Amino acid sequence: RELNSARQLLLWLWGPLQLGLEGALPLQQSSPFNEPSGTSIQLKQRNGAAVWDAIHQRLERAVTGGLSNATGQMLAIEGLHPERRRELLLALLRQLNAVLQRLRLDQQASAEKRSDRALSEHWQALQPELRKQALCTMAGHYVRLPMGEELSGVADHLILNTELEDIDEELPNPKRMLAPFLDDQPVLVDGQLLPADDPRALLQLETLVSNWLVRTAELIGSELLGVCGDWPELRRYLLDQRLISTRELERLRNQLNTQSRWQAWIQRPIRLY
């Protein structure tokens, strides 16, 4: 009863915006990355490992070549210095590659770890360390900046003052994203089960990995914006030039918090109902 009441309230408030336009065209679904012109994809072999290698290379080229925000939403990583943002995304890709290799070896060594539940639990357990390693790589293991009268290690400071174990419920399902790479499982695309090396399946897997990459970078980026306020030198090193001012940094954080609440309280319930 309560859920139905909430649904009716949301439709009454927002229904005219969503349902009341005759002949309206649906908005195009945006990808965090601009798609390169054409979809020329070459695979060394027709298996999950080769598909992952192709996706890995495509995303590395996209990140290295520079990204533009096509999500229609404000992103925390846009507040980072362009070089730090690029280093963070590349570090996450490298960590994902290392995790896939580890999962593949673990599954070969133990049949028990091949179940969907074991895969999901193992994947979730590896996320905090994956984020920590990517953060350290982005910050620079040996970079030290003035803090008062002393030099302080940037990576150590960030690890001590960030929370990297938060759970994002919008992250892709581990089985859907990982199983085709690990076990050569087929991919469900528009009601069809396709092999992972089919171009349609490959592009869907690339979208899932892109989603994971950007959302994980967002978790880290939000934490970074929160720890830079009291350390001017860290702001100059990590953040975009426009956010060196504490006032501008706080304004961006407030805007991101407002956007997050809007998505959690309004947009997500509407999608669920």
Residue ranges: model-predicted function:
Residues 92, 99-273:
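Long, charged low-complexity terminal regions
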Residues 74, 83-95, 99, 106:
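Eukaryotic N-terminal intrinsically disordered, low-complexity segments enriched in Ser/Pro
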Residues 79-82, 86-89, 113-116:
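Alpha-solenoid helical-repeat scaffolds
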Residues 1-69:
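Polyanion-binding and phosphate-handling cores
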